């Protein structure tokens, strides 16, 4: 079954629906989201993508990411995917948005207007093995060290988020999530 995404312009205005695989083959700018879940001890939840994923399999990434469906609100899509991938339900707060374009393989390009959401996880993940191979908590100050130590083990969008917003940005997102929970 084909999956459709929302093609957008550089200001995140919707243009039309686009087939997910075509969007990634052709590098079509589309709407996406990235979720960062924190615990109350200052750790961030990372997931290792399942080996069967069509791109970036086996790489470590932020807590959850995905795309809204056409006619689906981005925040609602983030809540939906968090439950589908990790079996978690929690309040999510929008904290940032940015645009990036990166090749993720010889054939596929991520060109996303990425909305970043944060939340506090109070339960343990119950991941769908088709989506998530493993998960782990990492002390937030260690994230940038891990990205530098083993860059090939992490998704390109996690690198771009860490570069763009820095350790201070992620710390402020955690504080924002705690204040909102």
Predicted regions span which residues?
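A short coil-to-beta-strand element that immediately follows conserved catalytic motifs
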Residues: 88-97
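A structural signal for short, well-ordered beta-strand segments
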Residues: 35, 63-64, 94, 115-117
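Acidic, metal-coordinating catalytic segment for phosphate/diphosphate chemistry
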Residues: 1-34, 40
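Conserved active-site beta-strand-loop modules that form the wall/rim of enzyme catalytic pockets
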Residues: 42-45, 91-92, 115
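Conserved Nudix-box catalytic region and its N-terminal flanking loop in Nudix hydrolases
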Residues: 22-33, 43-84
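Nudix hydrolase/Nudix homology domain
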Residues: 19-21, 58, 96-101, 108-181
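Histidine- and/or cysteine-centered catalytic micro-motif in compact active-site loops
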Residues: 40, 49-51, 97, 122
